[in-house]
Protein backbone atom coordinates (compact mmCIF):
# COMPACT_ATOMS: atom_id res chain seq x y z
CA UNK A 1 0.00 0.00 0.00
CA UNK A 2 1.59 3.26 -1.19
CA UNK A 3 1.24 6.56 0.55
CA UNK A 4 0.38 9.44 -1.82
CA UNK A 5 2.83 12.35 -1.96
CA UNK A 6 1.72 15.52 -0.25
CA UNK A 7 0.26 18.18 -2.53
CA UNK A 8 2.37 21.41 -2.44
CA UNK A 9 0.79 24.58 -1.30
CA UNK A 10 0.01 26.53 -4.48
CA UNK A 11 -0.61 29.81 -2.70
CA UNK A 12 2.82 29.81 -1.06
CA UNK A 13 4.69 29.02 -4.32
CA UNK A 14 2.81 31.66 -6.28
CA UNK A 15 3.49 34.27 -3.60
CA UNK A 16 7.23 33.62 -3.65
CA UNK A 17 7.32 33.92 -7.47
CA UNK A 18 5.50 37.25 -7.31
CA UNK A 19 7.90 38.53 -4.70
CA UNK A 20 10.90 37.56 -6.85
CA UNK A 21 9.41 39.21 -9.92
CA UNK A 22 8.72 42.44 -8.04
CA UNK A 23 12.17 42.40 -6.46
CA UNK A 24 13.84 41.92 -9.85
CA UNK A 25 11.86 44.73 -11.47
CA UNK A 26 12.60 47.03 -8.54
CA UNK A 27 16.33 46.33 -8.76
CA UNK A 28 16.35 47.09 -12.49
CA UNK A 29 14.53 50.37 -11.90
CA UNK A 30 17.01 51.32 -9.16
CA UNK A 31 19.98 50.55 -11.41
CA UNK A 32 18.52 52.56 -14.29
CA UNK A 33 17.76 55.49 -11.99
CA UNK A 34 21.26 55.43 -10.50
CA UNK A 35 22.79 55.29 -13.98
CA UNK A 36 20.74 58.25 -15.18
CA UNK A 37 21.40 60.31 -12.06
CA UNK A 38 25.12 59.73 -11.57
CA UNK A 39 26.31 58.92 -15.08
CA UNK A 40 24.22 61.22 -17.29
CA UNK A 41 23.06 64.00 -14.98
CA UNK A 42 25.97 63.85 -12.55
CA UNK A 43 27.86 67.05 -11.84
CA UNK A 44 31.02 67.25 -13.97
CA UNK A 45 34.36 68.02 -12.31
CA UNK A 46 35.49 71.62 -12.17
CA UNK A 47 37.29 73.00 -15.25
CA UNK A 48 40.49 73.58 -13.26
CA UNK A 49 40.63 69.96 -12.13
CA UNK A 50 39.92 68.70 -15.64
CA UNK A 51 42.58 70.97 -17.15
CA UNK A 52 45.15 69.85 -14.57
CA UNK A 53 44.44 66.17 -15.28
CA UNK A 54 44.74 66.67 -19.04
CA UNK A 55 47.98 68.67 -18.65
CA UNK A 56 49.48 65.91 -16.49
CA UNK A 57 48.53 63.28 -19.04
CA UNK A 58 50.02 65.27 -21.92
CA UNK A 59 53.20 65.95 -19.97
CA UNK A 60 53.69 62.29 -19.17
CA UNK A 61 53.20 61.43 -22.84
CA UNK A 62 55.81 64.00 -23.90
CA UNK A 63 58.35 62.78 -21.34
CA UNK A 64 57.81 59.19 -22.45
CA UNK A 65 58.48 60.21 -26.05
CA UNK A 66 61.70 62.01 -25.10
CA UNK A 67 62.90 59.04 -23.06
CA UNK A 68 62.27 56.74 -26.01
CA UNK A 69 64.30 59.04 -28.26
CA UNK A 70 67.21 59.12 -25.81
CA UNK A 71 67.11 55.34 -25.48
CA UNK A 72 67.12 54.93 -29.24
CA UNK A 73 70.08 57.28 -29.60
CA UNK A 74 72.13 55.48 -26.96
CA UNK A 75 71.39 52.03 -28.36
CA UNK A 76 72.03 52.88 -32.02
CA UNK A 77 74.74 55.55 -32.39
CA UNK A 78 74.33 57.68 -35.43
CA UNK A 79 76.81 57.61 -38.24
CA UNK A 80 77.53 60.73 -40.13
CA UNK A 81 76.15 60.17 -43.58
CA UNK A 82 78.49 61.25 -46.34
CA UNK A 83 76.47 62.39 -49.32
CA UNK A 84 77.80 62.11 -52.82
CA UNK A 85 79.87 65.13 -53.77
CA UNK A 86 78.15 66.77 -56.69
CA UNK A 87 80.15 68.80 -59.13
CA UNK A 88 79.83 72.46 -58.24
CA UNK A 89 79.99 75.39 -60.55
CA UNK A 90 83.30 77.22 -60.67
CA UNK A 91 81.47 80.54 -60.97
CA UNK A 92 79.68 80.44 -57.62
CA UNK A 93 81.86 81.14 -54.63
CA UNK A 94 81.99 78.52 -51.91
CA UNK A 95 81.36 80.31 -48.60
CA UNK A 96 81.64 78.70 -45.21
CA UNK A 97 78.55 76.67 -44.19
CA UNK A 98 76.05 78.59 -42.10
CA UNK A 99 75.61 76.75 -38.83
CA UNK A 100 73.34 77.70 -35.95
CA UNK A 101 76.17 79.38 -34.08
CA UNK A 102 77.17 81.34 -37.18
CA UNK A 103 73.64 82.65 -37.65
CA UNK A 104 73.38 83.67 -33.99
CA UNK A 105 76.78 85.38 -34.15
CA UNK A 106 76.00 87.33 -37.32
CA UNK A 107 72.64 88.49 -35.96
CA UNK A 108 74.05 89.42 -32.50
CA UNK A 109 71.58 87.17 -30.71
CA UNK A 110 72.60 85.40 -27.51
CA UNK A 111 70.10 82.69 -26.68
CA UNK A 112 71.35 82.48 -23.09
CA UNK A 113 71.03 86.15 -22.15
CA UNK A 114 68.63 87.71 -24.66
CA UNK A 115 65.38 88.95 -23.14
CA UNK A 116 62.02 87.79 -24.55
CA UNK A 117 60.54 90.15 -27.10
CA UNK A 118 57.08 91.56 -27.52
CA UNK A 119 55.22 90.95 -30.76
CA UNK A 120 53.02 94.02 -31.02
CA UNK A 121 53.70 94.47 -34.74
CA UNK A 122 52.95 90.80 -35.36
CA UNK A 123 49.67 91.06 -33.43
CA UNK A 124 48.59 93.92 -35.70
CA UNK A 125 49.31 91.91 -38.85
CA UNK A 126 47.51 88.84 -37.52
CA UNK A 127 44.53 90.98 -36.46
CA UNK A 128 44.27 92.50 -39.95
CA UNK A 129 44.40 89.06 -41.54
CA UNK A 130 41.70 87.65 -39.26
CA UNK A 131 39.54 90.76 -39.72
CA UNK A 132 39.71 90.36 -43.50
CA UNK A 133 38.88 86.67 -43.17
CA UNK A 134 35.80 87.49 -41.09
CA UNK A 135 34.72 90.19 -43.53
CA UNK A 136 35.01 87.79 -46.46
CA UNK A 137 33.00 85.18 -44.56
CA UNK A 138 30.14 87.65 -44.12
CA UNK A 139 29.76 88.09 -47.88
CA UNK A 140 30.60 84.57 -49.00
CA UNK A 141 29.16 81.19 -48.08
CA UNK A 142 32.38 79.34 -48.86
CA UNK A 143 33.23 78.63 -45.22
CA UNK A 144 29.68 77.46 -44.51
CA UNK A 145 29.71 75.20 -47.55
CA UNK A 146 33.10 73.76 -46.61
CA UNK A 147 32.00 73.03 -43.05
CA UNK A 148 28.86 71.29 -44.27
CA UNK A 149 30.89 69.11 -46.65
CA UNK A 150 33.38 68.20 -43.92
CA UNK A 151 30.69 67.32 -41.39
CA UNK A 152 28.79 65.21 -43.91
CA UNK A 153 31.87 63.53 -45.36
CA UNK A 154 32.59 59.84 -45.71
CA UNK A 155 33.46 59.48 -42.01
CA UNK A 156 29.92 60.24 -40.87
CA UNK A 157 28.51 57.15 -39.09
CA UNK A 158 25.35 55.43 -40.28
CA UNK A 159 23.35 56.23 -37.17
CA UNK A 160 23.58 59.99 -37.86
CA UNK A 161 21.30 61.84 -40.22
CA UNK A 162 22.44 64.79 -42.30
CA UNK A 163 24.28 67.38 -40.18
CA UNK A 164 23.13 70.97 -40.66
CA UNK A 165 25.03 74.04 -39.47
CA UNK A 166 22.60 76.32 -37.65
CA UNK A 167 24.97 78.93 -36.21
CA UNK A 168 28.50 80.09 -36.96
CA UNK A 169 30.26 82.87 -35.09
CA UNK A 170 33.90 83.69 -35.85
CA UNK A 171 34.32 85.88 -32.79
CA UNK A 172 35.24 89.51 -32.34
CA UNK A 173 38.61 89.51 -30.54
CA UNK A 174 42.09 88.59 -31.75
CA UNK A 175 44.86 86.35 -30.42
CA UNK A 176 47.69 88.07 -28.57
CA UNK A 177 51.24 86.81 -29.12
CA UNK A 178 53.92 87.77 -26.62
CA UNK A 179 57.10 86.67 -24.86
CA UNK A 180 58.90 85.47 -27.99
CA UNK A 181 62.28 83.79 -27.53
CA UNK A 182 64.63 81.85 -29.79
CA UNK A 183 66.16 78.60 -28.58
CA UNK A 184 68.40 76.02 -30.28
CA UNK A 185 66.98 72.53 -30.77
CA UNK A 186 68.27 69.36 -32.37
CA UNK A 187 66.80 67.71 -35.45
CA UNK A 188 64.24 65.89 -33.27
CA UNK A 189 63.01 69.12 -31.69
CA UNK A 190 64.61 68.54 -28.28
CA UNK A 191 65.98 71.61 -26.54
CA UNK A 192 69.76 72.06 -26.46
CA UNK A 193 70.56 73.75 -23.16
CA UNK A 194 73.81 75.21 -21.96
CA UNK A 195 75.11 71.77 -21.11
CA UNK A 196 75.00 70.92 -24.81
CA UNK A 197 77.68 73.52 -25.51
CA UNK A 198 78.55 75.10 -28.80
CA UNK A 199 79.37 71.74 -30.35
CA UNK A 200 75.83 70.48 -29.82
CA UNK A 201 74.35 73.51 -31.56
CA UNK A 202 76.37 73.19 -34.74
CA UNK A 203 74.08 70.62 -36.35
CA UNK A 204 70.77 71.75 -34.84
CA UNK A 205 68.30 74.40 -35.84
CA UNK A 206 66.67 77.44 -34.25
CA UNK A 207 63.16 77.45 -32.87
CA UNK A 208 60.98 80.43 -31.95
CA UNK A 209 58.57 80.02 -29.05
CA UNK A 210 55.88 82.53 -28.21
CA UNK A 211 52.96 82.67 -25.82
CA UNK A 212 49.46 82.81 -27.29
CA UNK A 213 46.32 83.94 -25.50
CA UNK A 214 42.83 84.21 -26.96
CA UNK A 215 39.69 85.09 -25.03
CA UNK A 216 36.72 85.09 -27.37
CA UNK A 217 33.47 83.32 -28.15
CA UNK A 218 33.83 81.31 -31.37
CA UNK A 219 30.71 79.19 -31.84
CA UNK A 220 29.66 76.39 -34.15
CA UNK A 221 26.12 75.02 -33.73
CA UNK A 222 24.76 72.00 -35.58
CA UNK A 223 21.67 69.86 -35.52
CA UNK A 224 21.08 66.29 -36.64
CA UNK A 225 19.09 63.16 -35.82
CA UNK A 226 20.13 59.90 -34.21
CA UNK A 227 18.76 57.01 -36.27
CA UNK A 228 18.04 53.71 -34.52
CA UNK A 229 18.26 51.04 -37.22
CA UNK A 230 17.80 47.93 -35.05
CA UNK A 231 15.94 45.58 -35.27
CA UNK A 232 14.77 47.25 -38.48
CA UNK A 233 15.73 50.53 -40.21
CA UNK A 234 14.44 53.78 -38.71
CA UNK A 235 12.85 52.25 -35.65
CA UNK A 236 13.32 55.50 -33.74
CA UNK A 237 14.58 59.00 -34.56
CA UNK A 238 16.02 61.27 -31.87
CA UNK A 239 16.69 64.93 -32.75
CA UNK A 240 19.93 66.35 -31.32
CA UNK A 241 21.19 69.94 -31.34
CA UNK A 242 24.72 70.88 -30.25
CA UNK A 243 26.57 74.17 -29.91
CA UNK A 244 30.33 74.19 -29.24
CA UNK A 245 32.06 77.45 -28.30
CA UNK A 246 35.75 78.18 -27.78
CA UNK A 247 35.88 80.45 -24.75
CA UNK A 248 39.63 80.70 -24.15
CA UNK A 249 42.86 79.28 -25.49
CA UNK A 250 46.29 79.85 -24.00
CA UNK A 251 49.51 78.04 -24.75
CA UNK A 252 52.98 78.20 -26.24
CA UNK A 253 53.45 78.13 -30.00
CA UNK A 254 56.65 76.67 -31.40
CA UNK A 255 57.82 77.59 -34.93
CA UNK A 256 60.94 76.46 -36.76
CA UNK A 257 62.24 76.16 -40.31
CA UNK A 258 63.16 72.69 -41.51
CA UNK A 259 65.74 73.10 -44.29
CA UNK A 260 65.28 71.09 -47.43
CA UNK A 261 67.78 68.71 -48.92
CA UNK A 262 69.01 69.32 -52.48
CA UNK A 263 69.96 65.64 -52.79
CA UNK A 264 66.47 64.16 -52.51
CA UNK A 265 64.65 67.32 -53.64
CA UNK A 266 62.78 67.91 -50.37
CA UNK A 267 61.64 71.54 -50.03
CA UNK A 268 62.07 73.84 -47.07
CA UNK A 269 59.11 73.62 -44.71
CA UNK A 270 57.72 75.57 -41.78
CA UNK A 271 57.00 73.33 -38.79
CA UNK A 272 54.78 74.49 -35.94
CA UNK A 273 53.17 72.89 -32.92
CA UNK A 274 51.92 73.74 -29.44
CA UNK A 275 53.66 72.66 -26.28
CA UNK A 276 51.85 70.35 -23.89
CA UNK A 277 51.13 73.13 -21.38
CA UNK A 278 48.24 74.63 -23.34
CA UNK A 279 44.72 75.13 -22.00
CA UNK A 280 41.55 75.02 -24.07
CA UNK A 281 38.27 75.98 -22.41
CA UNK A 282 35.08 75.02 -24.22
CA UNK A 283 31.41 75.73 -23.63
CA UNK A 284 29.10 73.00 -24.91
CA UNK A 285 25.31 73.23 -25.02
CA UNK A 286 23.07 70.35 -26.01
CA UNK A 287 19.38 69.74 -26.62
CA UNK A 288 18.11 66.17 -27.01
CA UNK A 289 14.57 65.15 -27.94
CA UNK A 290 11.61 66.55 -29.84
CA UNK A 291 8.85 66.98 -27.26
CA UNK A 292 10.32 66.21 -23.85
CA UNK A 293 13.76 67.73 -24.36
CA UNK A 294 16.86 67.24 -22.25
CA UNK A 295 18.94 70.40 -22.11
CA UNK A 296 22.70 70.61 -21.43
CA UNK A 297 23.35 66.99 -20.53
CA UNK A 298 26.71 66.98 -18.64
CA UNK A 299 27.87 63.62 -19.96
CA UNK A 300 27.37 64.68 -23.57
CA UNK A 301 29.46 67.79 -22.90
CA UNK A 302 32.24 65.69 -21.34
CA UNK A 303 32.33 63.26 -24.25
CA UNK A 304 32.45 65.99 -26.89
CA UNK A 305 35.09 67.98 -25.00
CA UNK A 306 37.29 64.91 -24.58
CA UNK A 307 36.93 64.12 -28.26
CA UNK A 308 37.92 67.65 -29.32
CA UNK A 309 40.98 67.63 -27.05
CA UNK A 310 42.04 64.27 -28.49
CA UNK A 311 41.60 65.57 -32.04
CA UNK A 312 43.76 68.62 -31.26
CA UNK A 313 46.44 66.59 -29.44
CA UNK A 314 46.79 64.12 -32.29
CA UNK A 315 47.52 66.86 -34.83
CA UNK A 316 49.50 69.79 -33.48
CA UNK A 317 50.62 69.16 -29.88
CA UNK A 318 54.18 68.00 -29.29
CA UNK A 319 55.63 65.57 -30.18
CA UNK A 320 53.32 65.88 -33.22
CA UNK A 321 53.57 68.94 -35.45
CA UNK A 322 52.29 70.39 -38.71
CA UNK A 323 54.50 71.10 -41.72
CA UNK A 324 53.79 73.69 -44.39
CA UNK A 325 55.79 73.70 -47.60
CA UNK A 326 57.24 77.14 -48.29
CA UNK A 327 57.33 78.56 -51.82
CA UNK A 328 60.43 79.97 -53.39
CA UNK A 329 61.21 83.49 -52.15
CA UNK A 330 63.31 84.38 -55.18
CA UNK A 331 61.81 87.44 -56.97
CA UNK A 332 60.05 86.43 -60.16
CA UNK A 333 58.27 88.36 -62.86
CA UNK A 334 55.10 86.29 -62.63
CA UNK A 335 54.75 87.18 -58.93
CA UNK A 336 55.11 90.94 -59.50
CA UNK A 337 52.01 93.00 -58.74
CA UNK A 338 51.22 96.70 -58.87
CA UNK A 339 53.01 99.68 -60.42
CA UNK A 340 52.12 98.91 -64.04
CA UNK A 341 52.30 102.09 -66.17
CA UNK A 342 51.66 104.25 -63.12
CA UNK A 343 53.40 107.47 -62.29
CA UNK A 344 55.20 107.88 -59.01
CA UNK A 345 52.77 110.39 -57.61
CA UNK A 346 49.58 108.80 -58.90
CA UNK A 347 47.01 107.45 -56.48
CA UNK A 348 43.38 106.50 -56.92
CA UNK A 349 43.14 108.15 -60.33
CA UNK A 350 46.12 106.21 -61.64
CA UNK A 351 44.71 102.97 -60.32
CA UNK A 352 41.39 103.74 -62.01
CA UNK A 353 43.14 104.38 -65.33
CA UNK A 354 45.04 101.13 -64.97
CA UNK A 355 41.81 99.27 -64.40
CA UNK A 356 40.22 100.90 -67.46
CA UNK A 357 43.19 99.77 -69.54
CA UNK A 358 42.70 96.24 -68.23
CA UNK A 359 39.03 96.37 -69.27
CA UNK A 360 40.00 97.65 -72.71
CA UNK A 361 42.55 94.87 -73.10
CA UNK A 362 39.93 92.26 -72.14
CA UNK A 363 37.49 93.68 -74.69
CA UNK A 364 40.10 93.51 -77.42
CA UNK A 365 40.86 89.90 -76.55
CA UNK A 366 37.16 89.02 -76.66
CA UNK A 367 36.73 90.68 -80.06
CA UNK A 368 39.80 88.88 -81.42
CA UNK A 369 38.34 85.51 -80.40
CA UNK A 370 35.03 86.33 -82.12
CA UNK A 371 36.84 87.31 -85.32
CA UNK A 372 38.83 84.08 -85.28
CA UNK A 373 35.63 82.09 -84.75
CA UNK A 374 33.90 83.73 -87.73
CA UNK A 375 37.00 83.23 -89.86
CA UNK A 376 36.87 79.52 -89.08
CA UNK A 377 33.19 79.41 -90.13
CA UNK A 378 33.93 81.09 -93.45
CA UNK A 379 36.80 78.70 -94.17
CA UNK A 380 34.49 75.77 -93.46
CA UNK A 381 31.90 77.15 -95.88
CA UNK A 382 34.48 77.56 -98.60
CA UNK A 383 35.50 73.91 -98.24
CA UNK A 384 31.86 72.83 -98.54
CA UNK A 385 31.38 74.85 -101.73
CA UNK A 386 29.20 77.54 -100.24
CA UNK A 387 29.54 80.91 -101.90
CA UNK A 388 31.57 83.38 -99.91
CA UNK A 389 29.77 86.32 -101.45
CA UNK A 390 26.75 85.62 -99.31
CA UNK A 391 27.28 87.50 -96.06
CA UNK A 392 26.62 85.84 -92.76
CA UNK A 393 23.48 86.55 -90.83
CA UNK A 394 23.94 89.70 -88.89
CA UNK A 395 26.94 90.89 -90.98
CA UNK A 396 26.75 93.48 -93.73
CA UNK A 397 30.05 93.90 -95.60
CA UNK A 398 32.24 91.20 -94.13
CA UNK A 399 34.22 90.46 -91.06
CA UNK A 400 35.98 93.74 -90.60
CA UNK A 401 33.06 96.12 -90.96
CA UNK A 402 30.46 94.52 -88.72
CA UNK A 403 28.32 97.52 -88.28
CA UNK A 404 28.34 100.84 -90.03
CA UNK A 405 28.60 104.02 -88.12
CA UNK A 406 26.44 106.93 -88.91
CA UNK A 407 29.17 109.37 -89.80
CA UNK A 408 32.20 107.40 -90.98
CA UNK A 409 33.36 103.87 -91.52
CA UNK A 410 35.47 102.64 -88.65
CA UNK A 411 36.18 99.38 -86.99
CA UNK A 412 33.50 98.78 -84.35
CA UNK A 413 34.34 96.19 -81.75
CA UNK A 414 31.51 94.18 -80.21
CA UNK A 415 31.16 95.04 -76.57
CA UNK A 416 33.58 97.99 -76.76
CA UNK A 417 33.08 101.10 -74.72
CA UNK A 418 31.19 104.02 -76.28
CA UNK A 419 33.45 106.42 -78.08
CA UNK A 420 36.37 104.00 -78.22
CA UNK A 421 37.89 103.98 -81.69
CA UNK A 422 39.87 100.93 -82.75
CA UNK A 423 41.36 102.33 -85.97
Curated annotation (Swiss-Prot):
Protein name: Maintenance of mitochondrial morphology protein 1
Main location: endoplasmic reticulum
Record lineage: Eukaryota, Fungi, Dikarya, Ascomycota, Pezizomycotina
Topological type in the membrane: Single-pass type I membrane protein
Encoding gene, per UniProt annotation: MMM1
A Pfam family per the record: MMM1
Domain of life: Eukaryota
Keyword tRNA-binding: no
Keywords, ordered alphabetically: Endoplasmic reticulum, Lipid transport, Lipid-binding, Membrane, Transmembrane, Transmembrane helix, Transport
The protein's role, per its UniProt record: Component of the ERMES/MDM complex, which serves as a molecular tether to connect the endoplasmic reticulum (ER) and mitochondria. Components of this complex are involved in the control of mitochondrial shape and protein biogenesis, and function in nonvesicular lipid trafficking between the ER and mitochondria. The MDM12-MMM1 subcomplex functions in the major beta-barrel assembly pathway that is responsible for biogenesis of all outer membrane beta-barrel proteins, and acts in a late step after the SAM complex.
GO biological process: aminophospholipid transport; mitochondrial genome maintenance; mitochondrial outer membrane translocase complex assembly; mitochondrion-endoplasmic reticulum membrane tethering; protein insertion into mitochondrial outer membrane
Lumenal side, ranges: 1-20
Transmembrane parts of this sequence: 21-41
Segments in the Cytoplasmic topological domain: 42-423
Any one annotated GO CC term: ERMES complex
Residue intervals of the SMP-LTD domain: 115-327
Localization: Endoplasmic reticulum membrane
UniProt cross-references to InterPro entries, sorted A to Z: Mmm1, MMM1_dom, SMP_LBD
One function term, GO molecular function aspect: lipid transfer activity
Domain notes: The SMP-LTD domain is a barrel-like domain that can bind various types of glycerophospholipids in its interior and mediate their transfer between two adjacent bilayers.
Bias (Basic and acidic residues) ranges: 355-372
Disordered, as annotated region: 332-372, 387-423
Subunit record text: Homodimer. Component of the ER-mitochondria encounter structure (ERMES) or MDM complex, composed of MMM1, MDM10, MDM12 and MDM34. A MMM1 homodimer associates with one molecule of MDM12 on each side in a pairwise head-to-tail manner, and the SMP-LTD domains of MMM1 and MDM12 generate a continuous hydrophobic tunnel for phospholipid trafficking.
Family recorded in the similarity comment: Belongs to the MMM1 family.
Listed HAMAP family: Mmm1
Coiled coil: none
Amino acid sequence: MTIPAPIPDKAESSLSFTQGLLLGQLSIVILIGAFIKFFIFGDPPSPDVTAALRATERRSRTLAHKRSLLTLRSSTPRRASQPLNRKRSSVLRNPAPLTTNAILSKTYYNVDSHQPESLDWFNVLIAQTIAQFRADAQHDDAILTSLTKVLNGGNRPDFLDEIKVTELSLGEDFPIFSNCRVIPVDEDGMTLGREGGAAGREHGRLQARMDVDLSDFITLAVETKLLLNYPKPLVAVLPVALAVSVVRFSGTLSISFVPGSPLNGSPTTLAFCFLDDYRLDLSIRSLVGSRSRLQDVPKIAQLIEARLHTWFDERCVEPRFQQIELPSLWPRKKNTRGGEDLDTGSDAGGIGRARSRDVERDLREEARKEVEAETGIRVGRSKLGVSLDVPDEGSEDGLRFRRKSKGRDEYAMPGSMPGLSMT
